[in-house]
A protein has these predicted regions:
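Short beta-strand to alpha-helix junction loop
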Residues: 104-117, 138-149, 183-202, 314-322, ...
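N-terminal Rossmann-like FAD-binding beta1-loop-alpha1 element of flavoenzymes
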Residues: 3-30
């Protein structure tokens, strides 16, 4: 029996697509190769950081990254080799690091950030239970130059709160005097991504959405301009519409005769317990070393580092040690109790713009990938966009696809 909608991928984007499609009255089946308990979305920092914060590729980032590489504090680590796509990615990254591109991207971030915030509110109204706080993002600066640069962008709209070192310590008690100050971006929020994922899974299962866990899609069958069959290692599944939301795994994208300019960026996190009085009062980002520190219900999580051009899925202890060393330079000594280390791959485009929309060849295939480190930030918005697109029937009929998809961005 042909299924109505098949979503391939059970991360935050896949589940958000399933949620929005279900809300429109569709019968949905989610196929996920793992057991759905520990994917990349679970290891996310949990930031909903769409507001007043620049994308990864922005003016000055190339020189700043080179400087940080000399200190072993760079957010990006490149494993150089004979991979042409890596060099294409780097060139596009450098090309995107200009004021015009950054201004446009930040405007889009705001538009779809609010869409995600609305979606999270709706999830909570639907009875989902997850840690969700709209208490801003604290941008902590360790370089005077970058702190002054950020202050110049602040206005009197209420979206910014400039803090000196003493005031910063009220929000982040463990910082030391090596920091320069901070800016609280008041519109941002944060969640516990694991709780979001589990709540979405439970809600969708109770709503009748079908989940095929531990079932890996290995190929497709094509007929004319349609995908006629989704081939898993267990069976062949037919569907009226297929949403491909497989994150950093390029294998299935290539099966559809596509090769997006996107790299699997390996990121790291450490989740631990610490005394309540020392925990950050809100989500925080050490902006100059690209390290997030996020409070949760019972724990704290730090996330950092993006490695490009590696397939090694094991935790690199050197990277973990480097994260701790970088953090220790700007904090008072404290103990990470019951620490859990994690790594995973994020689908990173060079300009933070995802690949969204109907496939150019196969009329029943929709792509939803490329959010990189912004999955939790924009996942719910992407779900809404993709669901609306499925009704519109064509990319050109959907303004959000035209605005926010890499298919329509130079």
């Amino acid at each position: 029996m042909k299924k109505e909608v098949v979503v391939i991928g059970g991360g935050i984007v896949g589940l958000s697509c399933a949620y929005s499609m279900y809300k429109l009255g569709h019968k949905v089946c989610v196929i996920e190769k793992s057991d759905g308990t520990n994917g990349t979305s679970f290891g996310n920092a949990g930031l909903i950081s769409a507001f007043k914060k620049a994308p990864l590729s922005c003016p000055g980032v190339v020189l700043d990254t080179l400087k940080l590489m000399l200190k072993n504090q760079a957010p990006l680590k490149f494993h150089f080799g004979l991979n042409l796509k890596l060099y294409q990615w780097i060139l596009k990254f450098m090309k995107s690091a200009n004021a015009k591109s950054t201004h446009r991207t930040m405007a889009l971030f705001e538009r779809y950030g609010w869409l995600s915030i609305d979606a999270y509110h709706q999830m909570l109204k639907d009875g989902m239970d997850f840690w969700y706080k709209e208490d801003g993002l604290l941008m902590i600066y360790t370089l005077e130059e970058s702190f002054e640069k950020k202050i110049k962008t602040c206005d009197n709209s209420g979206a910014y709160k400039i803090l000196n070192v003493k005031e910063t310590k009220e929000y982040m008690p463990i910082v030391n005097d090596n920091i320069c100050g901070s800016v609280l971006l008041t519109e941002n929020a944060h969640v516990d991504p694991g709780e979001v994922m589990r709540s979405l899974q439970e809600y969708l299962q109770n709503a009748g959405v079908e989940f095929l866990y531990n079932e890996e899609v290995v190929d497709f069958e094509f007929k004319n301009n349609l995908i006629d069959g989704v081939i898993t290692h267990k069976e062949k599944i037919q569907a009226e519409k297929i949403i491909l939301a497989t994150g950093a795994n390029p294998a299935l994208i290539k099966k559809t005769k596509n090769d997006f300019l996107m790299m699997g960026a390996k990121g790291y996190s450490i989740t631990f317990k610490m005394p309540e009085e020392l925990k950050p009062k809100t989500s925080s980002l050490f902006a100059d070393i690209f390290m997030a520190m996020t409070p949760r219900r019972d724990t704290v999580r730090i996330t950092s580092k993006l490695e490009l051009n590696t397939n090694n899925a094991l935790i690199d202890k050197e990277q973990i040690a480097n994260m701790k060393k970088n953090l220790a330079a700007f904090t008072q000594p404290f103990e990470m109790k019951d620490a859990i280390e994690w790594c995973g791959f994020r689908p990173l485009t060079p300009n933070d713009i995802p690949y969204l929309g109907f496939d150019k060849r196969y009329k029943n295939l929709i792509h939803a990938t490329g959010l990189g480190w912004l999955g939790i930030t924009f996942g719910p918005a992407i779900g809404k966009i993709i669901a609306d697109l499925s009704q519109d029937g064509a990319n050109e009929k959907n303004a959000d696809i035209m605005l926010f998809s890499a298919f329509f961005r130079d």
